């Protein structure tokens, strides 16, 4: 079956290629024939060994086996001219999977690859008798059964040499189902271009459906290289690259959420009555201490000379200025049990994705988890760290984007999915749906939305009062965006020392986060952006988010459709 994006653009096609095949029963001397083919098309030892493995897995006599995939016109000509001397050797036309967008869609789509020895042990030999390929990753893997189709057959009468004398019965093959995904190729391109050459990821969802509009992980790779088998050197370069292009950061990367967690902690405080919109702390000079404990938990603007802090801070200012001290204090008052219970409502610590088999669950720590994994009790300092999304908590970018979509929906949960139409969603999709986050007064949602809006739009209010992202993305914006920046620590900074990005090796710098949804009044898109080792989330990740939202809300087919309506 074929795969299309939400606008009908073909993103997984089947392309005709020519393969060199061999039927063992028609070959007098296999090694001599392979030697002759080596002269004509050049067969490596690896290719010959792979062919012999495929030959050993044949299901029936007179079944042709590919020797070489994707013949060039020159190779076809050389074999054709010498065909008289190569009984049992044929050039066969086959359809093979082709990804027209190459590396752009690799991590969103997954890929098909050649069936290997391990695969063959578990596959239905009849169902796969017409193909050498199998969905191995992502959507291609999850919907393999629906995309595969069914093989046809002919019942024939042959002579002693295997030549067909009469066709007794035949059933034509049936193609697999075509799928349409939620993903938008234009938005995918915009997200990829916004990230540029940096390592990172973007996940964007439609809050109304949970449909994944874009899923980018960079660097990427060309999935076409794997369809008919990648050579060892090319694979080794991808496998051993320090930038790990084969790693799907959007689904498998697990990172501290940093300050992107603060709106969820704030809502937990409001839901449980632990804080109020009016409650105010005085943050000066920018650190927090637990009772009977000398350790300083510092705000992000703390300085060694004693400067720092945010002055008087209520919940709204705590979000738009990203005040750590407010959330240290709130987390301790909440306690880990209530934090764990309420964050789980948004899907943290859970894998709720339907059709992305590589997605991971992140980690939402608890007392029980720490006791079971480390044999240690939960300490108050652990709770302090969770208050600003650090410590043991881990999220995947998909998971964080999904939580932001639930926030944008005022508590209506969604299940992230790639499939838009074409086949029925599996039964397990129903089990993935979380209960809605209910019994939250509208004024609490309004307060969180307004506070996240001020992260982006509050500017020109005097020193120290601008939203953390305003200077980077808040000017000349044509819609209302709710956002929150965050940084995830990669290495710890000793007590009493300032974080100096210039002094750190690039791979030790913080990861930059930005989450957002827009328009605030009627959210159409929610997203999470991560730039690995990028530094500050507002400075580095928020411009990426702005470019993506500008494209989707102001330039894309979505915008055209809105105007038509």
Regions found by a protein language model. Give the residues of each.
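A conserved hydrophobic secondary-structure block that centers on an alpha-helix together
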Residues: 165-211
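Gram-negative outer-membrane assembly/targeting C-terminal domains
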Residues: 551-565
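Solvent-exposed, polar/charged alpha-helical surfaces in well-ordered, non-transmembrane soluble domains
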Residues: 18, 31-35, 39, 69, ...
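Beta-lactam-recognizing serine transpeptidase/beta-lactamase-like catalytic domain environment
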Residues: 12, 158-168, 207-260, 264-528, ...
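Second-shell loop/turn segments in exported
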Residues: 18-26, 34-38, 61-69, 94, ...
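Short beta-strand segments enriched in hydrophobic/aromatic residues
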Residues: 112, 407-408, 530-533
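Membrane-proximal periplasmic segments of bacterial cell-envelope enzymes
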Residues: 1-164, 171-172, 197-201, 207-208, ...
